[in-house]
Swiss-Prot record:
Pfam families noted in UniProt: YbaB_DNA_bd (PF02575)
Family the UniProt entry places it in: Belongs to the YbaB/EbfC family.
UniProt protein name: Nucleoid-associated protein GDI3467/Gdia_2910
Residues making up the signal peptide according to the UniProt record: none
Protein species of origin: Gluconacetobacter diazotrophicus (strain ATCC 49037 / DSM 5601 / CCUG 37298 / CIP 103539 / LMG 7603 / PAl5)
């Protein structure tokens, strides 16, 4: 019975830490870039795109295809950085214990 009470207490504490971590993630912003910094994309902690910054040199209609590719690459870079940050925060909550394969938090 004592072990069960201890497990329940740990579960409650972990839930509180996870909620705190989720709030922290939601408040952060991550910026990814591509094209040697010519395109920057900013995501919030939920992964929603909030801003795109494009070097004026890429506004040339002849460079439109490259610009489109760089926006996609910058989004992928920002998402990768966000996933890494979320993983770091989750390890803090779980004491370094990795999540089961395929289980991602908070997305």
């Amino acid at each position: 019975m004592k072990n069960l009470a201890g497990l329940m207490k740990q579960a409650t504490q972990m839930q509180a830490r996870m909620e705190e971590m989720q709030s922290k993630l939601e408040g952060m912003t991550i910026e990814g870039s591509a094209g040697a910094g010519m395109v920057h994309v900013t995501l919030n902690g939920k992964g929603d795109m909030k801003a795109v910054k494009i070097d004026p040199k890429l506004a040339d209609p002849a460079e439109m295809e490259m610009l489109q590719d760089l926006i996609v690459a910058a989004c992928a870079d920002a998402r990768k950085l966000l996933d890494e940050r979320a993983s770091e925060e989750m390890k803090k909550v779980t004491g370094g214990m990795n999540l089961p394969a395929g289980l991602k938090f908070p997305f």
